[in-house]
């Protein structure tokens, strides 16, 4: 993946197989209709059970997002349980940037999981036999080899599905008639939990971590994904080979950015992203970093979050917050609340970034009982769009867990009325926020984009 891959050889055609979504669609009378005809619809997605995209909780997870002080909340998130069978869960966090970043993030949130399912079944159909079949237990060496081979096969299938679905997603964004992605894009950190197997696909600087216990039952933080930023040597080398430029501005020397060869724009603060087609010929790619991990009984939970969290909280601090939460249903919100406090303490003159958090508990259980106050803040119903919860008093956070770090080597055509209403609501909240921060003359600490590019022959805007 070291070359410039703005043009790929993958087919433009999307497979039309019918994956089982845990909805009884397999074997239905709709067999002759394409999968995308039945599923890639916002209204149909809303009706899918065990899929949440707004602040709330599910059987084994909780998710929460809060708008920052930069404008419309450009973060999106999803948890989809019973994704293809009872033991499969899909989770994702998508951080948008640029003028239409919020729309890109939501489009990817809605479309990428469907593409992943469709392509997985397309690949599986060529392999013969159902995914997830395991060799029967046996003490013989042959049985162990068969199971190992099956694990490798499953790993290969998921990797190919991740690679092809990310590629198909980026192609759809490029050709989308109503979604301008030339200077807008989004990150994606996505995971599939299938039994004890964890499959991860990541682009950009959103991150996934694992909260686990060591031999002394102390909590440790394991980073599962690499922040794919331009300062990584392999990323910088690819970008430079494609004539893109990588450097940091004088007033933020710690933030390396990607620039066009002929203009000091757009200054993208990540090396891989969906969209951002102004840079796709100059080394920015949408190929995910794929990884696989076998979970153990010591592994407790997984946290996915946008960089608005990681800019101010360490992996250990996030694990500490989740592990010490008195209610699992409130864990994601507690992480966001902690990040908000840290933004105010560390960068009082900066505009806080959007924050989005997904917490997936690996034992599959949430709280047995939930207080009335929590029920008001967290809805288990499936939501069409994310909404900002009304903020009450900040919860008291009792930290009684010591956490160590364990490092790893793995570095549509229409959105319709629903999206329009969401945008109007968010814009109203943005205006209110701007009034509250009207006296702030500080700078935004880290913008994903510095400015929009000007191309030869284009008149400068005055």
Curated annotation (Swiss-Prot):
<dbReference type="Pfam" id="PF00481">
    <property type="entry name" value="PP2C"/>
</dbReference>
<feature type="region of interest" description="Disordered">
    <location>
        <begin position="369"/>
        <end position="394"/>
    </location>
</feature>
<feature type="binding site">
    <location>
        <position position="95"/>
    </location>
    <ligand>
        <name>Mn(2+) 2</name>
    </ligand>
</feature>
<feature type="compositionally biased region" description="Basic and acidic residues">
    <location>
        <begin position="424"/>
        <end position="434"/>
    </location>
</feature>
<comment type="subunit">
    <text>Interacts with GCN5.</text>
</comment>
<keyword id="KW-0904">Protein phosphatase</keyword>
<dbReference type="InterPro" id="IPR001932">
    <property type="entry name" value="PPM-type_phosphatase-like_dom"/>
</dbReference>
<feature type="region of interest" description="Disordered">
    <location>
        <begin position="421"/>
        <end position="443"/>
    </location>
</feature>
<keyword id="KW-0464">Manganese</keyword>
<comment type="function">
    <text>May act as negative regulator of GCN5.</text>
</comment>
<comment type="similarity">
    <text>Belongs to the PP2C family.</text>
</comment>
<feature type="binding site">
    <location>
        <position position="307"/>
    </location>
    <ligand>
        <name>Mn(2+) 2</name>
    </ligand>
</feature>
<protein>
    <recommendedName>
        <fullName>Probable protein phosphatase 2C 1</fullName>
        <ecNumber>3.1.3.16</ecNumber>
    </recommendedName>
</protein>
<feature type="binding site">
    <location>
        <position position="95"/>
    </location>
    <ligand>
        <name>Mn(2+) 1</name>
    </ligand>
</feature>
<keyword id="KW-0479">Metal-binding</keyword>
<dbReference type="GO" id="GO:0046872">
    <property type="term" value="F:metal ion binding"/>
</dbReference>
<feature type="binding site">
    <location>
        <position position="96"/>
    </location>
    <ligand>
        <name>Mn(2+) 1</name>
    </ligand>
</feature>
<feature type="binding site">
    <location>
        <position position="353"/>
    </location>
    <ligand>
        <name>Mn(2+) 2</name>
    </ligand>
</feature>
<keyword id="KW-0378">Hydrolase</keyword>
<dbReference type="InterPro" id="IPR036457">
    <property type="entry name" value="PPM-type-like_dom_sf"/>
</dbReference>
<dbReference type="InterPro" id="IPR015655">
    <property type="entry name" value="PP2C"/>
</dbReference>
<feature type="domain" description="PPM-type phosphatase">
    <location>
        <begin position="60"/>
        <end position="362"/>
    </location>
</feature>
<feature type="compositionally biased region" description="Polar residues">
    <location>
        <begin position="376"/>
        <end position="385"/>
    </location>
</feature>
<keyword id="KW-0460">Magnesium</keyword>
<dbReference type="GO" id="GO:0004722">
    <property type="term" value="F:protein serine/threonine phosphatase activity"/>
</dbReference>
